[in-house]
Amino acid sequence: MKETRARQYFLRIPDGHANPLPRPSDAVTDRAFRELVEDANRNGDCIINVGRGYYRPRPEDAVDEKELKEYLAKELSRARKIQTKRLAMKIAFEKRRDVEVFTNHTREA
């Protein structure tokens, strides 16, 4: 039922920034809707939300192009932060492994 509502909501996403579609007020529908947007963007669509709601930016519109660049910059920043965190966690884990191997080795002696 919620997926159907999310799908209906998804189908209303407009072209251009003039009348963006706000997020659904229902949390479950909102989650399903955002998953649909994510899947669509992964599969060749271009849907953005820079705060006022969702829309498909139009190439001939300067505002849309500016907001797309803003959106893509934020996505790149998020991706870099995730990569940095991932690397830090991996290094921390390997350090713990080294300490445990050293500690276990010295305890056995």
Language-model segments: what does each one mean?
Residues 1-11:
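Short alpha-helical segments that sit at the start of domains
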Residues 62-87:
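Short, amphipathic alpha-helical interaction segments positioned at domain boundaries
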Residues 28-42:
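Short amphipathic alpha-helical interaction segments
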Residues 16-27:
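Short acidic, hydrophobic short linear motifs in intrinsically disordered regions
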Residues 85-109:
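Exposed, interaction-prone assembly regions rather than primary DNA-binding/catalytic cores
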Residues 41-52:
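A short, conserved structural fragment
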Residues 52-59:
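Minor-groove-contacting beta-hairpin "wing" of winged helix-turn-helix DNA-binding domains
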